[in-house]
């Protein structure tokens, strides 16, 4: 009767039932086929019998030393046959292999092995004289050292151990702390060996051993072939990095399978893209797949199968895998695939609850591949290895990777590292998002973004990206790429790009980020050597810039611009302070923004030194505001009446500013309305998937996300500044016909920057939105402005009441004393009033200061009030500001008013609506607000007291709380009659609400205004306290919500 042929899966089940250890399974192959080739290393070959004999001899020596079961044994040998022999010998003796990178210093190796209480190390001739105080056994790879036997002898069988035996301890890289010692069980290796993704290994295969044995993927190189009766072919690092030589070696040795890193594939794409064409299986992993590199490989000569494999050390080699196809290249994204074998993958939210398909969450892995845990680190074990209620798996590993499972096919997409977010100058940044954006410029074959701590005081951290330019790329590729990045990324995510000929790799064949960080520091140091000798005003100023920015600034570079070099608002504030201390002159922040080039700012300083006074606001600026108000005058109003966007056949909303605070809440309210069928959101993003993620994250930030929202969301990648909103002419025209209504909330908001920096997004952006409103069908534009468009008109002009539809020019006199955002709002509103007078279907809403949700307390932790509350709590004091009101209005009330008015198109068009407390008695004075905060702080560790504004400013300068640091110039610069911008808001006028009150008369059941009392303030403070532990942006009053 013929023997039964088992399937691959049946073989695995049989191996699990038999429960034999790895060494015993190898022994079975050696017993059945002793002459089969096991290892090829250059001119040295070992058969299965040879390898058995050498391992058995070394194992006997270990056993004579009374080696305990699972006792750690260090392996310090060069890459090659000795490594294979050493590992096999340790398992023959029932020990645990602890592979060490032989390039590590002795002290590091000693420290790692000491922590494991190791007694023995296996070394080769090259490492036998190192200063390692352990009992050494020498692994000799010379064939003369061993006698040949005719057959494998039964009495040399390895020790009997099970699949639960700890075979290896692999140390993680330890980039931020001591390396973690990860335990690997035999069952984990067996799981991968029998489930090599998509194609099993066959005895005829030759598997490249390319990985350093301290790297867990080397376990595949060694144990996958030996447990399947195949052959290992050792590939040196020198060969691996010479891609043309590697290709020839693969061909000459008949190598069929290789597991390597994404970094090596990227290198091959740049140097010799046909390097892997002879392989049957090529696994890549370790870093996110590079679409550009894969496309190059596919065009030149791909392997038969290219597998994108995923697996942290704690899950042993591979746990997910995806066969890469040309369709992936065309789609621009490569999945990390689906679980292999019996692996279980869960995607969970921060509370550990599984998320629905299509949602982002942390990847948790369960199954046979999961490690028993870290050695001697119980706290990290509790944090990293967890249980999931309702799952058959007892333990899951929290990978720290953020992923998303596709709704369409169940493939899992890698989004980024939970801990690969970095904080640069206060901003939370996903490095993968920066790298992806750089690659999409089409200028580079590879890019690596990283955070570098600058060596100079005050510079803080810098976002740097090293990139490999494509062949044929023009010399100005970097400048071109930066321009493209600025169109799709926030300013703080645009890195300083450094060119490099090829990416350096470390001993694990991954990109060597530490080397790149040091390379940047070295480049900076070389350029900075001669800068300290500069004694001119320009030279001293250049030195100040360099010390603050952490980049070289040659004094001879007339065109150097402080902000184009990457300066943030906080660094601008720091420069103002440094200028005063260095030159003993005062320069306002607005002056810096308007004169940000080195030559112009140096000229201003020289004028100040000579005693020239700064004129606060030129007449030309007033003229510019008036002229900019006419930018849309040439637009022709629609001839047809606007469509009723609330009709069942309509309900298609075009929305800007959806990622902002108010925009997120309005978006959620729109998506909940049954008459709204789709909301197209203009969003800064490199592609729709990224855009959808930004919108989803914006909603989730305030706990607004609901599963059903995704069916109505339409991300439209673009920017306000572009004539066609970044959509292109055809898509622009298509959206103009598609939209039933426009809600325009997108704006740049920065309380320290001038009008010139707000103009592109706010003024020109509104002109572009108006062009969309005029194109296609007639539709209403709902514009959300602010009462700040009047500036400090109560103090400057003496205005006591502001009517809703009154002309804005009468408040122009107050405008120079406010910030650039308020000035841009005045210009936009004046523009819209001119159009409404000509029949344009426009509605304008002017909210007061928008606070958090009145029910949930969810508020913007980065707005002025939140920053003030947190900072005053830290300082223990708040400023007494008489006769000031902020007209606080909760966000849910604001949006309820807007949507109710917007639903009545016929009566709403052509009007302006103030959204402030409905009567003066409900409008809280600023002092009353802060006293409320102080009273809620009583009984805590510190109380908050009111002090004079001057005393508070002195405390502010002394304590410099982080949350107010970017705003200090605004709070301290004296603009008029010795008063600061904030003090000028004394005697705020009453904002008439006649239009709003009339419109709300038809609100079903009436709309009650939520008063800012102690209960509501407590909700806000509690929310801020929870969020204060979360990452904070350096200046959230700085950004464009498009």
Curated annotation (Swiss-Prot):
Induction context: Expression is regulated by a complex signaling network which may include cross-pathway interactions mediated by sensing of the cluster final products or shared biosynthetic intermediates.
GO BP terms, alphabetized: biosynthetic process
Region annotation (Short-chain dehydrogenase/reductase (R) domain) ranges: 655-897
Keywords: Ligase, Multifunctional enzyme, Oxidoreductase, Phosphopantetheine, Phosphoprotein
O-(pantetheine 4'-phosphoryl)serine modified-residue sites: 569
PROSITE patterns given in the database record: AMP_BINDING, CARRIER
Transmembrane segments: none
Disulfide bonds: none
Family annotation (Pfam families): AMP-binding, NAD_binding_4, PP-binding
Known pathway: Secondary metabolite biosynthesis
Catalysis performed (reactions): L-tyrosinal + AMP + diphosphate + NADP(+) = L-tyrosine + ATP + NADPH + H(+)
Annotated region described as Adenylation (A) domain, given as residue ranges: 29-425
UniProt key word Oxidoreductase: yes
SMART domains in the cross-refs: PKS_PP
Consequence of gene disruption: Abolishes the production of piperazines and suppresses the formation of sclerotia when lnbA is also disrupted.
Family annotation (Gene3D superfamilies): 3.30.300.30, 3.40.50.980, ACP-like, Luciferase, Domain 3, NAD(P)-binding Rossmann-like Domain
EC class name: oxidoreductase
Domain Carrier positions: 532-609
E.C. no: 1.2.1.101
Domain notes per entry: NRP synthetases are composed of discrete domains (adenylation (A), thiolation (T) or peptidyl carrier protein (PCP) and condensation (C) domains) which when grouped together are referred to as a single module. Each module is responsible for the recognition (via the A domain) and incorporation of a single amino acid into the growing peptide product. Thus, an NRP synthetase is generally composed of one or more modules and can terminate in a thioesterase domain (TE) that releases the newly synthesized peptide from the enzyme.
Family listed: Belongs to the NRP synthetase family.
The protein's role, per its UniProt record: Non-canonical nonribosomal peptide synthetase; part of the lna gene cluster that mediates the biosynthesis of diastereomeric piperazines. Lna and lnb clusters encode sets of enzymes that produce overlapping sets of previously undescribed metabolites such as piperazinomycin-like metabolites or morpholine. The lna and lnb biosynthetic pathways appear to be part of a signaling network that controls the formation of sclerotia, a resilient overwintering structure. One primary function of the non-canonical nonribosomal peptide synthetases lnaA and lnbA consists in the reduction of L-tyrosine.
The protein, known as: Aldehyde reductase lnaA
